[in-house]
Amino acid sequence: MKMFHKIYFGDSVVKLTEEMVKSLENEIVFIATASKDGVPNVAAMRAIKVLDAEKGIVLIADNFMNKTLKNILENPKVALTTANCKDMPYQYKGTAEYYKEGEYLKIAEEVDKALKPDLKPKGAVVIKITEIYNLKSGPDAGKLIAKDE
C-alpha cells in the first residue's frame, strides 16, 4: 500500500504551526468537498489527527461519511476550516486519498478510541494540505499564507 506522506518528497512550504495542529485536533473541523459535477457539500468532523505538521499531512477517520466520501472519491480536492475561526482563522486546501486498510486505518482506529471507544472507522481520509489562507476579518482576509508548488 502506498503511504501518502511518502509520495511528497523534499521540503514542503506548507507547514502547520503548533497552534494549527492543536486547533485541527481539538476543534470541530468542517470539510468542504464537491462532486465531479461541482455540487458542494460541507460536513463537520471530529476524529482528526495531524500525521506530519512539517509536510501538512492530516488524517480524518471515516465514521459516518456518505456524501463527503462519495465526493472525495470523485474529486479529491478538499478544503478544511475549524469551528473556532475567531482564534484560529485559517482555511486549509488540499488533496485527499481514502484508505480502507493498512496503517492509516489503524491510526483512525486509535483516534476514534480516544474520542469514543465504541466507534469503529470504515476507513481513513488522508489529506495533503497544499494551501493555507487567512480567514481573519480585515485587510488580509483571504490572503494566501502558504502554498506548495
Curated annotation (Swiss-Prot):
Top-level taxon of origin: Archaea
Pfam families reported in the protein's UniProt record: PNPOx_N
Record InterPro entries: Pyridox_Oxase_N, Split_barrel_FMN-bd
Protein name per Swiss-Prot or TrEMBL: Uncharacterized protein MJ0282
Native source organism of the sequence: Methanocaldococcus jannaschii (strain ATCC 43067 / DSM 2661 / JAL-1 / JCM 10045 / NBRC 100440)
Lineage of the species this protein comes from: Archaea, Methanobacteriati, Methanobacteriota, Methanomada group, Methanococci
